[in-house]
Regions:
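Short conserved segment of the HATPase_c
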Residues: 81-93
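Short alpha-helical Gxxx[C/S/T] motif in the catalytic ATP-binding
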Residues: 108-112
Length: 147
């Protein structure tokens, strides 16, 4: 579970923080469709990358809702990804130009995107080189499936 990621982060002197949107008592709960095992796999791949490419600062996991989706956003203070590489990071064997010294074949994001697309969800990336990245996992809510 999450503990192993906390330990990996701690080994690099990084903290993983959680933030959620505070719900008012009257707010209806949001129901989203996802497969727990595969969703954790997708989130895990993103966390692994965040830890691998962040040397100072930390990682924040935020729960939010956006239009008809429930989302989990993972923000890091890592090396960031240039705009021209955004599409490529989801490729099957991608490893960034800036990360030649790191080990491992980048199948993680390819798999994460594939997993998210199964229930009709998606992944969004926003990033600034040298400042960090945010990967958003968007899960369809109950309303979407009725459309």
């Amino acid at each position: 579970g999450m503990e192993s990621y906390r330990e990996k982060a701690a080994a690099k002197g990084l903290a993983i923080a959680f933030s959620g949107t505070k719900k008012a008592e009257k707010d209806a709960p949001v129901y989203a469709y996802f497969d727990k095992k595969w969703s954790m796999e997708a989130l895990g791949n993103i966390l692994d990358n965040a830890i691998k490419y962040t040397n100072t600062g930390g990682i924040t996991i935020k729960l939010c809702s956006y239009e008809l989706f429930a989302c989990v956003e993972v923000t890091d203070t890592g090396i960031g990804i240039g705009e021209e590489e955004h599409a490529a990071v989801f490729g099957r064997f991608y490893r960034g130009n800036a990360v030649a010294e790191k080990s491992g074949v980048g199948i993680g994001l390819y798999l994460a995107r594939f997993i998210m697309q199964q229930p009709g969800g998606y992944i969004r990336l926003s990033s600034t080189p040298g400042k960090g990245s945010t990967f958003g996992l968007y899960f369809p809510t109950a309303i979407v499936s009725k459309l």
